Amino acid sequence: MDFNKENINMVDAKKAKKTVVATGIGNAMEWFDFGVYAYTTAYIGANFFSPVENADIRQMLTFAALAIAFLLRPIGGVVFGIIGDKYGRKVVLTSTIILMAFSTLTIGLLPSYDQIGLWAPILLLLARVLQGFSTGGEYAGAMTYVAESSPDKRRNSLGSGLEIGTLSGYIAASIMIAVLTFFLTDEQMASFGWRIPFLLGLFLGLFGLYLRRKLEESPVFENDVATQPERDNINFLQIIRFYYIDIFVCFVAVVFFNVTNYMVTAYLPTYLEQVIKLDATTTSVLITCVMAIMIPLALMFGKLADKIGEKKVFLIGTGGLTLFSIIAFMLLHSQSFVVIVIGIFILGFFLSTYEATMPGSLPTMFYSHIRYRTLSVTFNISVSIFGGTTPLVATWLVTKTGDPLAPAYYLTAISVIGFLVITFLHLSTAGKSLKGSYPNVDNEQDRAYYAEHPKEALWWVKERKN
């Protein structure tokens, strides 16, 4: 491949930070919706599955509606991924936030089972399906856009900022539910209180749309993809044939990230209430505090990943959860409130290593002309099978085995697999250019360096297979 130093991408670090904010709003929207749903499962179950008398089965049906919706994420990933690779990242990010806001609003407006019968759970499922379809293109698009707009040397630190949106959305959901449960009676929450956060989610979506309309297309897409449209002809079968190892590593990384993520953010509140017997307000405050602490931790690990490589930070997370998952869940059963907090913090601490590294590292696994679609499909298939089903699987394991530590065994097993795959198959790309792209730099010194060292600038050429 002929090297042209004029193709080195000069990016503005300040603009890169603004892209993190604009894309992070979408993450906040997604996780605000998910957090509200997770915290209000008891009320949602009572409204949409009221004929079911058994509370455990009603809860499983409510989680099942969430899990089934995840099956639509890969379809959304295919559709939005193809559009994103062909027409640009920005158009997809604008579309997905509109669809997410609409589906969140719809859930807040739905009549209950007592009002319209079987249509109530059907409409709830359809709203979750729309949410799943739209988020199928959202997170992969946000990761791709931020990675392609950031200086290579700061890709992980800026990418970790994307997860502030994730954590902030969940924190906002947690605070709102805590406030509502404090001021409203349980009867009022079951009647109308649970709907309020879903209705307010519309305003978060509109704010995100306003910010995203101001975004420019990523420099990598403009310089390396849009100018070479003939490279889009490669199909998914060819992608799998050429890059099956990269796809496998990405799949496993998303598995251990999302099983941990959904275990802590979606299942743990229910676990603390139903197994540990903490009240809803205490649970909400605890999870909110841990999420807040995770924000600076994620930013710290993001900077660390840029210095020592994301592979080592991955191994801190997978290794830590291999050793401490069971211990953390055991601490949750302590009679001491402080010890319970420590147990939750252990899980949040190691989760923050994934929050820090995933946004900046997953997009680097694929070449520019196939990045969005391949990442989107791989990410969403993995999330659909393992992420969205985590609360359902964890609930089933406890019910089936009678062992309250069963979720910890599951988390440990996933972490062991992740540790082995990352150790033997993952290549650290921190500080390197994205595959298929010229380097992204934010100063003339780095630009001059790569101009004089083309082999380092295009390190990926020798690995390319199509």
Curated annotation (Swiss-Prot):
Top-level taxon of the source organism: Bacteria
PROSITE patterns: MFS, SUGAR_TRANSPORT_2
SUPFAM superfamilies: MFS general substrate transporter (SSF103473)
GO MF annotation list: symporter activity
Similarity section: Belongs to the major facilitator superfamily. Metabolite:H+ Symporter (MHS) family (TC 2.A.1.6) family.
PANTHER family: ALPHA-KETOGLUTARATE PERMEASE
Protein name: Putative proline/betaine transporter
